[in-house]
């Protein structure tokens, strides 16, 4: 199986909140019309205060995530402090841009919380870096954006935004054939740092939405 062809059909969502950020994805990896994997991890912990999502090639995405994790850890050791969200996003953008002639086939959302507050950046394969209050990537993003546009507010807190993110991913899964097989949700707050929600917690929230 050629990993370059997997994970093309994906839906990811990122939301900035007053007290942190929320990331959500579905779990299906596709290869053309074939469902290649049904339990794909698409949210990664880069550091205690930074998370990222992936859409694109499995091999490229995993390589980029490992690179960013290593650089964040190295920065912490060298400087005795955490890398800022903007600096981590700029690092990812530089990695992507330097490889633009043999690009990473990946679109990444990277965000977290630092002394400057909660931030999320969208990064494309050529190294473009755009800050967003809310953003979605992948084949299901047009559907997800409909939910985000309707329900996003600058006054959202993480607990509320989790429900918005789940609703956006759930809607995309219902309309996009390349998205499905469950939902992953992670939050990053100043108090708790990175936290991945359990399947039970996500399922309970889905039931409450219904």
Swiss-Prot record:
Family annotation (CDD domains): proteasome_beta_archeal (cd03764)
Provide this UniProt record's keywords sorted from A to Z: Autocatalytic cleavage, Cytoplasm, Hydrolase, Protease, Proteasome, Threonine protease, Zymogen
- MF GO annotations: threonine-type endopeptidase activity
Source domain of life is Archaea
SUPFAM superfamilies, alphabetically?
A: N-terminal nucleophile aminohydrolases (Ntn hydrolases)
Q: Name one Pfam family in it.
A: Proteasome
Propiece residue ranges: 1-9
Catalyzed reactions per annotation: Cleavage of peptide bonds with very broad specificity
Record-listed E.C. numbers: 3.4.25.1
Q: Which family does it belong to?
A: Belongs to the peptidase T1B family.
Q: What is this protein called?
A: Proteasome subunit beta
Which species is this UniProt entry from? Methanothermobacter thermautotrophicus (strain ATCC 29096 / DSM 1053 / JCM 10044 / NBRC 100330 / Delta H) (Methanobacterium thermoautotrophicum)
């Amino acid at each position: 199986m050629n990993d370059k062809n997997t994970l093309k059909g994906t839906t990811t969502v990122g939301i900035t909140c007053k007290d942190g950020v929320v990331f959500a994805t579905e779990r299906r990896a596709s290869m053309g019309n074939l469902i290649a994997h049904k339990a794909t991890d698409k949210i990664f912990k880069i550091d205690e205060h930074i998370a990222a999502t992936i859409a694109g090639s499995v091999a490229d995405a995993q390589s980029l995530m490992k690179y960013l994790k290593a650089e964040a850890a190295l920065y912490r050791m060298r400087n005795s402090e955490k890398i800022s969200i903007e600096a981590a996003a700029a690092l990812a953008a530089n990695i992507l841009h330097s490889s633009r002639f043999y690009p990473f086939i990946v679109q990444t959302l990277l965000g977290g919380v630092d002394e400057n507050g909660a931030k999320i950046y969208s990064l494309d394969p050529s190294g473009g870096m755009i800050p967003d209050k809310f953003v979605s990537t992948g084949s299901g993003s047009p559907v997800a954006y409909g939910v985000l546009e309707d329900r996003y507010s600058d006054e959202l807190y993480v607990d509320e935004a989790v429900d918005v993110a789940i609703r956006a991913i759930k809607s995309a899964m219902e309309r996009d054939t390349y998205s499905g097989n469950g939902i992953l949700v992670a939050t990053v707050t100043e108090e708790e740092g990175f936290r991945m929600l359990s399947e039970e917690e996500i399922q309970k929230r889905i039931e409450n939405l219904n």
